[in-house]
């Protein structure tokens, strides 16, 4: 069944369907980090360890696209050596999304994350978080405790 869900999602993504565009417009207007009731891509979430039970939390995170922005140095130098453009981050947008979600929810642990959608300005990821103190999942994910 999840194979069909995956095929449908791929078809929507390739055809740039109106449904997903409308969702993206709503996501763009909303806050950066949003807790959602259930994953948008259930097939991907299940593959990465999500289960529909208490203690699992799914969060959609919006990350800006493009290169890093670095402030212009105050001291004089030739423009070529300013070091303000063409700077790449050492972390991926997915890692940035996971870090932001874990900062917003400090009592939860990041299990995994996956890509949802991107447009010209933003990329959206859904991050699966775990409440390790919840009795429903405490024994199953005991190895994640620090």
Report the location of each language-model feature.
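Ribosome-associated RNA-binding proteins
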Residues: 1-146
């Amino acid at each position: 069944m999840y194979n069909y869900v995956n095929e449908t999602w791929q078809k929507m993504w390739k055809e740039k369907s109106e449904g997903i565009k409308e969702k993206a417009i709503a996501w763009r207007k909303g806050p950066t980090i949003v807790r959602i009731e259930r994953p948008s891509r259930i097939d991907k979430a299940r593959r990465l360890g999500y289960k529909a039970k208490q203690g699992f939390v799914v969060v959609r995170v919006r990350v800006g696209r493009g290169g890093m922005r670095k402030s212009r140095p105050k001291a004089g130098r030739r423009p070529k050596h300013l070091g303000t453009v063409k700077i790449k981050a050492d972390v991926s947008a997915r890692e940035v999304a996971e870090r932001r979600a874990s900062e917003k929810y400090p009592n939860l642990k990041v299990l995994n994350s996956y890509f949802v959608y991107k447009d010209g300005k933003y990329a959206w990821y859904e991050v699966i978080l775990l409440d390790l103190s919840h009795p429903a999942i405490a024994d199953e994910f005991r190895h994640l405790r620090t």
